[in-house]
Amino acid sequence: MKTLKKIAVILIILVVIGFLGFKLVANKIISDAKVLTFEEIDSGQLKDGEYLGNYEIFPVKVSVKTTVLNGKITQIELLEHFNGKGAPAEKIVDDIIEKQSLQVDAVSGATVSSIAIKKAVEDSLLGK
C-alpha cells in the first residue's frame, strides 16, 4: 500500500510540473506574439489582384488569399489555419476588411491566432 501511495504522489508531482511547464511555454508564446508590429496599409498603393500570404508562430500556422479590388481589400480567405483553440480568431478578417487596416484588436482568447492571421494578411499585401 505504501508503494501505491508513493507512485500516486510521484504521478501528481509529475502532472503538476508538466502543467506548469506548459503554462510557462504558452505565456512565452503569447508575450512574443504581442510585441509583433504591423505595417500600415496604404490603400492608394494596393494593386487589384489576389495575393497569397503565410505566417507561422508556434503552434499556429496560417495561409491566406487576400483579394484587392479598386484599391480596397474586399475578401480575405483563410486557406489554412492550424489553430489549436484559436478558431474564434477567424472573424478578425471581417474587422480588417471593414477598417482596411491591420490595426484591429485581437480576438479575446485567441490572441496568437489573431496575430498570426494579421501577419499572414500583411505578408500577402506587403510581402513581409
Provide a role label for each language-model segment.
Residues 1-63, 67-128:
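Intrinsically disordered terminal and processing segments
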